Amino acid sequence: LVLLDIKHINDEEHIKLTGRTNKNILDLAKYLSEIKKPVWIRHVLVPKRNDYDNYLIELDKFIKELDNVYRVEVLPYHTLGVYKWQELGIENHLEEEGIKPPSKERIDNANELLHTKSYTRYLK
């Protein structure tokens, strides 16, 4: 089983969010599908970054192309670890920009658009 985090489906926006391309992540997802390795897709939902409907619909389309996805989880962005960043002297652009955790409505919307309830396969 592989837990695969897809933070953003759009490469340009992924780079803005993480500083890195998503190409390797998406290629790995396709490869894992080819070899039938079970995967749980996890998507950290960040307001004003990757919670827009068009991105969620695009991510859903990508996930549907894979035939090895056992679960899709929406993980709401939170600020519980902000103090760790501060202690390490690492800039947190999301905090600086006032990004807050998503509302229940946005979380529910993401779960609906990503059809998270449709993924109920279990490992044997």
Where are these regions (language model features)?
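Radical SAM enzyme core and accessory elements
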Residues: 116-124
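A generic structural signal for well-ordered alpha-helical segments
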Residues: 32, 114-115
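A structural motif corresponding to the C-terminal lobe/cap of the Radical SAM core domain
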Residues: 54, 61-64, 70, 85-113
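Short aromatic/hydrophobic-glycine micro-motifs
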Residues: 37, 90, 119-120
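Serine/threonine-rich low-complexity intrinsically disordered regions
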Residues: 48, 103, 116-117
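Conserved AdoMet/S-adenosylmethionine-binding subsite of the radical SAM
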Residues: 1-80, 84-87
